[in-house]
Amino acid sequence: MELCGLGLPRPPMLLALLLATLLAAMLALLTQVALVVQVAEAARAPSVSAKPGPALWPLPLLVKMTPNLLHLAPENFYISHSPNSTAGPSCTLLEEAFRRYHGYIFGFYKWHHEPAEFQAKTQVQQLLVSITLQSECDAFPNISSDESYTLLVKEPVAVLKANRVWGALRGLETFSQLVYQDSYGTFTINESTIIDSPRFSHRGILIDTSRHYLPVKIILKTLDAMAFNKFNVLHWHIVDDQSFPYQSITFPELSNKGSYSLSHVYTPNDVRMVIEYARLRGIRVLPEFDTPGHTLSWGKGQKDLLTPCYSRQNKLDSFGPINPTLNTTYSFLTTFFKEISEVFPDQFIHLGGDEVEFKCWESNPKIQDFMRQKGFGTDFKKLESFYIQKVLDIIATINKGSIVWQEVFDDKAKLAPGTIVEVWKDSAYPEELSRVTASGFPVILSAPWYLDLISYGQDWRKYYKVEPLDFGGTQKQKQLFIGGEACLWGEYVDATNLTPRLWPRASAVGERLWSSKDVRDMDDAYDRLTRHRCRMVERGIAAQPLYAGYCNHENM
């Protein structure tokens, strides 16, 4: 019987209606799930605005901050030398720092003409800087430079005291971070007392200028950001297999033939500029010339330096590491490193020594003969150690110290006392730290801080959570741990992405190496780092965001 006139849906129409209803329910459920995920993520890392107030990074050793607010007027505030300071107007390093930090404090904001009721507020009119010992104004920073300082902020004069200029530079950065604008646009600072010094003496950033050439202006920008985060070592991995951009005075063919192009080189003037720019910010420039591996670009401009590699048919088919059997190798290296010691004033040279591939040496009959003559048998680690020992002796004769990657220690090279070992292999690095320090060698750590290994999300947290001294050993061993480095290797990094890939991720490493072991509060770190990141952006550093949020300066 046909039901006419009732308007009931036919079976196909009913099925379509049911499917539509089911689809709508599923979409609603998925929306709810997505909302729950978003809420959970927001709860884990809340969206933080750039709220007013100081955000110190890295956190000083001791901070006593009162609620008493003082004000600064850009046109009526000066940074100058204390009358009893051992440094004075002739100290170019401090004079330039005074101008620089006045600009950091006031120059990146729209100056605000304050309403009349705010003109009479208590003001800080001057920051007096006092160096109490020999200033070292014209010196270069070194591994034992004193970076301690005290800062007393009160009206009408704030006082910054440091034993050396290096501590004054760190204190100026802290003072600049204390200043903020209130809701009226007034430059404000809390009455404060700060006593500060770094936990570790070596706090480095590694840049790689071989895989990709980095223009000098990018290196200088990196040095600025390092100063904002109180890093004090630029580890300059300047050459590698891919290119040789260092323009040697003695061996110009190294860069003429080994660089990507003649415009992709660092001239002597470029190198001097980087070193002086770093010095004015209290930063050492540590050059790395990695041998005997990672040297293919060297061979293009230096004949007979590299080892010929042979196929199974005894045919020459490529070149490998530096040839460790020839006297000419060591004559070249002696002359080359003498030049490096004169160009780079730092007391250390990083000699590399990592990832040496033995297959080429194994294929070369002359290398095999040399091994037999020396009694090395077939243990190519002994040949590697033979080479490393020769290079270490060269460095010692030019009165420089050596830093090496951990393989040099692992492969039983005879290291001179005081040789610094850099631990970079992420697997079981605490055990490696224990072994190196048990043998009496100073150590620096980079294994957990390879910033080229990127991941989506807030990976700064894992860098921040590392406790460098969390390895087995005596107190004497722990004292041999002198610091660490955040490394940004250059296979996938050039001038377009170096800065946002470094910052603020490297900032997490900076606080871990400067601040007390007890500074561990992740929520507080997130709040401070979010605002510190905004401050870096205001100062011209293209630091990537930590999470959802905003910076106050974005609408200025």
From Swiss-Prot:
pH dependence, entry free text: Optimum pH is 4.
EC supergroup of this enzyme: hydrolase
The keyword Iron-sulfur is annotated on this UniProt entry: no
Modifications the protein undergoes after translation, according to the UniProt entry: N-linked glycans at Asn-142 and Asn-190 consist of Man(3)-GlcNAc(2) and Man(5 to 7)-GlcNAc(2), respectively. The beta-A and beta-B chains are produced by proteolytic processing of the precursor beta chain.
Membrane-crossing residue ranges in chain numbering: none
GO molecular function: acetylglucosaminyltransferase activity; beta-N-acetylglucosaminidase activity; beta-N-acetylhexosaminidase activity; carbohydrate binding; identical protein binding; protein-containing complex binding
Annotated S-S bridges: C91-C137, C309-C360, C534-C551
Keywords linked to the UniProt accession: Cytoplasmic vesicle, Disease variant, Disulfide bond, Gangliosidosis, Glycoprotein, Glycosidase, Hydrolase, Lipid metabolism, Lysosome, Neurodegeneration, Signal, Zymogen
EC numbers for this chain: 3.2.1.52
Active-site residue list: E355
Signal peptide interval: 1-42
Tagged with keyword Membrane: no
Chain positions listed as propeptide in the UniProt record: 43-121
InterPro entries per record: Beta_hexosaminidase_sua/sub, Glyco_hydro_20_cat, Glycoside_hydrolase_SF, Hex-like_dom2, HEX_eukaryotic_N
GO cellular component labels: acrosomal vesicle; azurophil granule; azurophil granule lumen; beta-N-acetylhexosaminidase complex; cortical granule; extracellular exosome; extracellular region; lysosomal lumen
Function of the protein: Hydrolyzes the non-reducing end N-acetyl-D-hexosamine and/or sulfated N-acetyl-D-hexosamine of glycoconjugates, such as the oligosaccharide moieties from proteins and neutral glycolipids, or from certain mucopolysaccharides. The isozyme B does not hydrolyze each of these substrates, however hydrolyzes efficiently neutral oligosaccharide. Only the isozyme A is responsible for the degradation of GM2 gangliosides in the presence of GM2A. During fertilization is responsible, at least in part, for the zona block to polyspermy.
Matching PANTHER family: BETA-HEXOSAMINIDASE, BETA-HEXOSAMINIDASE SUBUNIT BETA
Protein's UniProt name: Beta-hexosaminidase subunit beta
